[in-house]
From Swiss-Prot:
Catalyzes the reduction of hydroxylamine to form NH(3) and H(2)O. NCBIfam families: hybrid_clust, PRK05290.1. It is an enzyme of class 1 (oxidoreductase). The gene is hcp. It catalyses: A + NH4(+) + H2O = hydroxylamine + AH2 + H(+). Belongs to the HCP family. This is Hydroxylamine reductase. It comes from Shewanella sp. (strain W3-18-1). The lineage of its organism: Bacteria, Pseudomonadati, Pseudomonadota, Gammaproteobacteria, Alteromonadales.
Length: 554
């Protein structure tokens, strides 16, 4: 086992990364090894997808499968070995199919089929035991003694960034947003990473390409969500429970939320969002369901307590899932799509009747809590609508600075930095937030500036796209570069989606971003210095010191 993809990973003087019997996230060594082997097989599929494309062969089913299966290897997504094995077996079948199609096309064109790299040649074992015996060939640091640590760090930066992009591709696909050109470039990068390059310059350039690719993917996802559910609107949301039977929907998948809402109409069940599903409450399409009553709980790391206290059924539509046995709710939590936990019921297809039956059988909430309201819904359209007023308030001096504070949440104590930062921002500043990092301060009162709320909840982590659009619009109005705006970006990272959002911002030339609370363990000191020198990327320090720098206070 070697896994170093999330903030929780082990850090010791002897080296970083989880490499024993179990990772800090709870992932067993066998699961980690199977996921590495799955990635290896997917890279082999991409090798043939690239070669097949050169001869005009495009398989949309395979284009969708590879990022979806890759998504299953993100932090806190799938802990079920049997599901990972099944993905690997399917990858082997798809690779064989593409290989046959490619070789036939070569024969018809009078060409000799090209030799493929080792990553596309493995004969996958037929059982879990056999696959585990093959896992060493796919270990991410298998050649660590033969290469410079910076090369390994760059490979991992690319791999983990591409994982984040794969997740957004799958979220977009669910909403019928696909792009053959994007899929083709995705395969090219997967195939390149499968070759274990030692070219640092090419790896760094690839990391930037992944950021650019993800910008297109986030635009696709934005289109999918707004075309399916309308543009988010500023919306007041209750964060307390309501009397009645209950279903809690966590993750990121709004299509699943829509299906659950449709199937619970007239059933006497209240539906709540959780975590990154909170922004759904601002979409017009969901407002026609009066039984979507609000948001329950907070960010992913608190789920074992929050789900244990929730007297209904829980659906995990995507990351992040953690051990449901700790809170003794494994019999009433359901996984969906790429999510998996051993022994937990998995919903296949679009029938959520098992979830509904479980909710009806459970007690539900016995009384209404005193409501606590927050305002959400400041995504792209709402931000653009507010732009003229924002510009006027900047010009008259009422708004002097913007802060984008968001990203992933986590359970480390030093994440209180983000709470204190938000509370310490000047009264003449605007705070934009997104991702589950918002839960560090989104229930606090920040007031407004001439009717403009000081705290603007932009949405999910992928809605960084909306914040980027606002920054571009403001830069155009003020005829300046984005980096010349009175804008400071402070991103909390935990896993691979945050990595790819960061790569996207860097690839767009955004500078002087702060990340925290700890730097990724796979980034060497040399790589961190390169990123600081090139982009001004730095780690958070103290709220007081960082604010002085961001506000240019001597």
């Amino acid at each position: 086992m070697f896994c170093i993809q999330c903030e929780q990973t082990i850090r010791t003087p002897a080296g970083n990364g989880c490499s024993y019997s179990q990772g800090m996230c709870g992932k067993l060594a066998a699961t980690s090894d199977l996921q590495d082997l799955l990635i290896y097989m997917l890279q082999g599929v991409s090798v043939y997808a690239v070669k097949a494309r050169e001869l005009g062969i495009v398989d949309a089913e395979i284009d969708s499968f590879v990022p979806k299966a890759f998504f299953s290897t993100l932090t806190n997504v799938n802990f079920d070995d049997e599901r990972i094995v099944a993905y690997a077996q399917q990858a082997a079948k798809y690779r064989a199919s593409l290989k046959a199609a490619y070789e036939l096309a070569c024969e018809r064109a009078g060409k000799v089929a090209e030799q493929v790299p080792e990553v596309a040649q493995l004969v996958l074992g037929t059982s879990k035991v056999e696959m585990l015996s093959q896992a060493p060939i796919a270990l991410l640091n298998k050649d660590k003694h033969e290469i410079h640590e910076d090369i390994l760090g760059l490979r991992l930066l690319c791999l983990y960034g591409l994982k984040g992009a794969a997740a957004y591709m799958e979220h977009a696909r669910v909403l019928d947003q696909t792009d053959a050109e994007v899929a083709g470039r995705f395969h090219e990068i997967m195939a390149f990473l499968g070759e274990s390059s030692v070219d640092g310059d090419k790896l760094f350039a690839t990391a930037m390409e992944i950021g650019q690719l993800n910008y297109r993917i986030m635009a696709m996802l934005d289109a999918g969500e707004t075309q399916s559910f309308g543009h988010p609107e500023p919306t007041v949301v209750n964060t307390k429970s309501v009397k009645g039977k209950a279903i809690l929907v966590s993750g990121h998948d709004m299509k699943d939320l829509e299906l659950i809402l449709e199937q619970t109409v007239g059933k006497g069940i209240n539906v709540y969002t959780h975590g990154e599903m909170l922004p759904a409450l601002a979409y017009p399409a969901f407002k026609k369901y009066p039984h979507l009553v609000g948001n329950y709980g907070s960010a992913w790391q608190n789920q074992q307590k929050e789900f244990a206290n929730f007297p209904g059924a829980v659906v995990m539509t995507s990351n992040c899932i953690i051990d449901p046995n700790v809170g003794s709710y494994s019999d009433r939590i359901f996984t969906r799509s790429i999510v998996g936990w051993p022994g937990v019921m998995h919903i296949i297809g679009d029938d959520f009747s098992a979830v509904i039956d479980k909710a009806l059988a459970l007690e539900g909430f016995n009384y209404d809590e005193i409501p606590h309201k927050i305002t959400i819904g400041f995504a792209r359209n709402a931000l653009m609508a507010a732009a003229p007023a924002v510009v006027e308030n900047v010009k008259n001096g009422s708004i002097k600075h913007f802060f984008l504070v968001g990203g992933c949440d986590g359970d480390k104590a030093d994440r209180s930095y983000f709470t204190e930062l938000a509370k310490s921002t000047p009264k003449d500043s605007i705070i934009l937030t997104l991702g589950c990092g918002k839960y560090k301060f989104n229930k606090l009162e920040f007031g407004d500036i001439n009717g403009i709320p000081r705290l603007l909840d932009v949405g999910q982590c992928n809605d960084a796209y909306s914040a980027i659009q606002l920054a571009i619009a403001l830069a155009e109005v003020f005829e300046c570069d984005i980096n010349e705006l009175p804008l400071s970006l402070v991103l909390s990272w935990f896993e691979q989606k945050a990595i790819v959002v960061l790569l996207t911002l860097l690839s767009l030339g955004v500078k002087n971003i702060r990340t925290g609370p700890t730097p990724p363990a796979f980034l060497t000191a040399n790589l961190a210095k390169i990123l600081e020198d090139k982009f001004g990327l730095r780690n958070t320090t103290t709220v007081e010191a960082d604010l002085k720098t961001m506000l240019n206070v001597a």
